[in-house]
Curated annotation (Swiss-Prot):
The gene coding this protein: Kcnip3
Binding positions (Ca(2+) 2): 223, 225, 227, 234
Record's subcellular location: Cytoplasm; Cell membrane; Endoplasmic reticulum; Golgi apparatus
Residues in EF-hand domain copies: 67-123, 126-161, 162-197, 210-245
Function field: Calcium-dependent transcriptional repressor that binds to the DRE element of genes including PDYN and FOS. Affinity for DNA is reduced upon binding to calcium and enhanced by binding to magnesium. Seems to be involved in nociception.
Residue positions where Phosphoserine is found in the record: 14, 60, 63
Family per similarity comment: Belongs to the recoverin family.
Classification of source organism: Eukaryota, Metazoa, Chordata, Craniata, Vertebrata
Protein name in UniProt: Calsenilin
Region (Disordered): 1-22
Membrane topology classification: Lipid-anchor
Origin species: Rattus norvegicus (Rat)
Subunit structure, as described in the record: Binds to DNA as a homomultimer. Dimerization is induced by binding to calcium. Interacts with the C-terminus of PSEN1 and PSEN2 and with PSEN2 CTF subunit. Associates with KCN1. Component of heteromultimeric potassium channels. Identified in potassium channel complexes containing KCND1, KCND2, KCND3, KCNIP1, KCNIP2, KCNIP3, KCNIP4, DPP6 and DPP10. Interacts with KCND2 and KCND3.
Amino acid sequence: MQRTKEAMKASDGSLLGDPGRIPLSKREGIKWQRPRFTRQALMRCCLIKWILSSAAPQGSDSSDSELELSTVRHQPEGLDQLQAQTKFTKKELQSLYRGFKNECPTGLVDEDTFKLIYSQFFPQGDATTYAHFLFNAFDADGNGAIHFEDFVVGLSILLRGTVHEKLKWAFNLYDINKDGYITKEEMLAIMKSIYDMMGRHTYPILREDAPLEHVERFFQKMDRNQDGVVTIDEFLETCQKDENIMSSMQLFENVI
């Protein structure tokens, strides 16, 4: 039961909480707030847990440390270059690559594999759609595969990035068609995918209209000029003035 309750918390860059947990009749007059991330919820982030679980040293040689394994079909960028691109230390990059290589010997993660990973962490629901959206957010060049470089750059932003960088990453996740705007349709698709991932056995039971209500609250807060879309400027300005979001972003720092 405790795990089910904890699974309700947002993760993987999601800034949205769950309005479905409080009956509508009791929410009147209550100021809407996004829940803060907990360290426990963050450490259950599928990507982090998946990689770190395989990152323990297993007698690897120096070639592992230098990210130059001839058996890997996709060779990642050099260690120095990745260290310059991210906010990870050399030792952290070596550990992350060891875990990535153990799980993905080819050096690539395709979308089907990514969905399988998420399905294992959310067996009570359907994580397929949310995994699709998250995969596209990590697949920076849109080539249908997540390279180690894609993984560590995204992870660096989520764990060590500035608030501005994290918010831009979150906006990119919500902007499904990457046209620079978040529409109600896009946000509803994201919210439905999150609720589907939670499953039907959560407690308290989620109401059917919770995703739509969440979207309406999101746009009331974010759509400053009420033109039906949320721009990156509106998103950044509103979020950076929200103490709840600012506090939640700090929990991404120094986790690894």
